[in-house]
Structures are given as C-alpha cells and as structure tokens.
Amino acid sequence: MRKIPLNCEACGNRNYNVPKQEGSATRLTLKKYCPKCNAHTIHKESK
C-alpha cells in the first residue's frame, strides 16, 4: 500500500493522503471537505 495525495478539483490544493493498492489501474476520486474552498468538493488522485 502506498500513500496517494488527493487534489481539490476547484482550487488544486493538496488536502489528503490516502492509502491505495499498488496494482490498481483506475484513478481515485472522492468527495471530501476542502478547508480552502470551505465546501465538500471532488478530490482526484494526483500523479
């Protein structure tokens, strides 16, 4: 398992690090709270 940073779609801020399996081919997308936007936004896995 590796820690993957998640970026906010709205502002691009890196807010979370989540564990992910190494062999997974799909990119992770989660709806999480962004303190900079002060709202729940979609966060996508960064490279």
Curated annotation (Swiss-Prot):
This protein's UniProt keywords: Ribonucleoprotein, Ribosomal protein
GO molecular function, one term: structural constituent of ribosome
GO-annotated biological processes: translation
Keyword check for Acetylation: no
Keyword Hydrolase: no
Entries under SUPFAM superfamilies matching the protein: Zn-binding ribosomal proteins
A GO cellular component annotation in the UniProt record: ribosome
InterPro entries: Ribosomal_bL33 (IPR001705), Ribosomal_bL33_CS (IPR018264), Ribosomal_bL33_sf (IPR038584), Ribosomal_zn-bd (IPR011332)
Family statement: Belongs to the bacterial ribosomal protein bL33 family.
Record protein name field: Large ribosomal subunit protein bL33A
Gene name of this polypeptide: rpmG1
